[in-house]
Amino acid sequence: TTTASISQKFCTQPPLADVPEVLLWRQYSSALSITHDVPMRTKVGCNDGFTRAFTQSFLMANGKPIYAAGSGYQGDNTLDAVKSNRDERLQLFVWGESNKVDTDPAAGKPRKLYAAPGDTLSYITTSVVETRCITGYQPRKYYTYDYAQSMNDELRGTNACPIFRTAEAMLNYMEACYELTGALDATAQGYWKALRKRAGVDTNYQTTIDATDLSQEGDWSVYSGTTPVSTTLYNIRRERMNELFSEGLRYQDLIRWRSFDKMLTTKWIPEGANFWDEMYKSYLDKKGNAPKADGTADAVVSSKDLSK
């Protein structure tokens, strides 16, 4: 099963009864007035967004972290560059410049979130709180190209919501096995290879472990309390994060790992996309002025003197 089929099967269809991976799911129905707003909320911003540390956690297709020698990382001047040759879950579930927003004929002309200068639909620079993406890394998981579900904010979503699937069970086993024994048995190894294969990542997880430098990993799951974990355990946690993000489990994981404790001793400043090297050019107004970034209450992006 490919990552693309993950999206098609359990992220973008109303019934999930015929999807073996999904063990428990919630059904929605416009006829029963049980609907949601996820399609529209992933189409526009939702006053949220993934952090730079999160996107950096995804491996390259060759299994190496982005900072490792020979990784092939293309940098972060554009969102498409960030996603290039990476774990296919990052490619699929985070919006980039080349992703079309509307392809359903009912929507009219196909559009993109990040397009040519003056022709962008991105919600990075809007001052409207409920439709802005505050980091530039806009979530795309559960988006559907069925325009009837995303034409407005009137709770038109009817696609099903997976609650528990076999991938989570596999990750649970991997983590428990390593925490209990300090090693991975044949079953855990097989699960890990299967998850990586489906994500388009080299199945040799030892390549990743050997190339991991915890001092260059910006994610909280590096820590249990304020103590760094082993590179093996961190990579098991990385796999869990990269597989299950946007599925409502992240906060619980960080709590049970006591990863938030690190903030008791170290300041944490969330970072977003690299805006000021290249991306800003798509947000100039007709006079060539960049978005307001002077630190005042109505500024819409951070100053280029403080960040990229």
Language model feature labels by segment:
Residues 60:
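Active-site-adjacent helix-turn-beta-strand microarchitecture at beta-sheet edges
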